[in-house]
Amino acid sequence: MARKDVLLAMLVVVAWGLNFVVIKVGLHAMPPLMLAGLRFLLVAFPALLFVARPKVPMRLLLGYGLTISFGQFAFLFCAIKFGMPAGLASLVLQAQAFFTIILGAGIFGERLQVKQLVGIALAVVGVLVLIEASLTGQHIPMLGFMLTLAGAFNWACGNIFNKKIMQHSSRPAVMALVGWSALIPIVPFMVCSLIFDGP
């Protein structure tokens, strides 16, 4: 791998990690669902000025936006609000990879390889260890942990929608898909914030 590619990969890792720190800081200033809604508001509208709507069925675009954008981040922001450590949340959220493998096998009939089964087994053991730590009071709130897992599952569902979208005849550009899908969760976030966070 070229040095440039390694540096770009490292930049992505750093940006991903800082994302959780920023969420943690932001939650000190405003409720989780409102913060998440504003995040997508700031992403969506500038993007709409530069990219056309992807030519895919609206049901797929809605499914993608409501899972990978709304579901994932609604649960994640609430998890951190309820005490889930930001660093641990970034790790637990990666359970999406194993949820994606399982969903892919069930929906697309993808065959599970031995190394994937071993990975899933190790992930389950890791989850059980974290649950045990939560139950014994080692500063891992059970509610925050379960909400993070729910976020990971929604991310996995979004991956399934993404695969269906990319199999469509008019395969959209990634930037168009990300930009327009960011528009979808704004209203759900604001409505849920009004209901759960209060006016």
What are these model-predicted stretches?
Residues 34-44, 77-111, 116-120:
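Specific alpha-helical transmembrane segments that line the substrate/conduction pathway
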Residues 13, 65-70, 94, 148-156, ...:
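Residue-level hotspots within the lipid-embedded alpha helices of multi-pass solute transporters
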Residues 14-15, 19-23, 48-93, 101-103, ...:
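Specific transmembrane alpha-helical segments of multi-pass solute transporters/efflux pumps
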Residues 18, 22-25, 29, 42-57, ...:
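Membrane-interface helix-cap regions at the ends of transmembrane helices
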Residues 44-47, 100-101, 106, 137-198:
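Transmembrane alpha-helical segments that form core, pore/gating elements
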Residues 56-60, 90-93, 109-129, 138-145:
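Loop-to-transmembrane alpha-helix entry segments
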Residues 8-9, 61-65, 90, 120, ...:
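Residue-level signature of transmembrane alpha-helical cores of multipass secondary-active transporters
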Residues 41, 47, 64, 102-103, ...:
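Hydrophobic transmembrane alpha-helices of multi-pass small-molecule transport proteins
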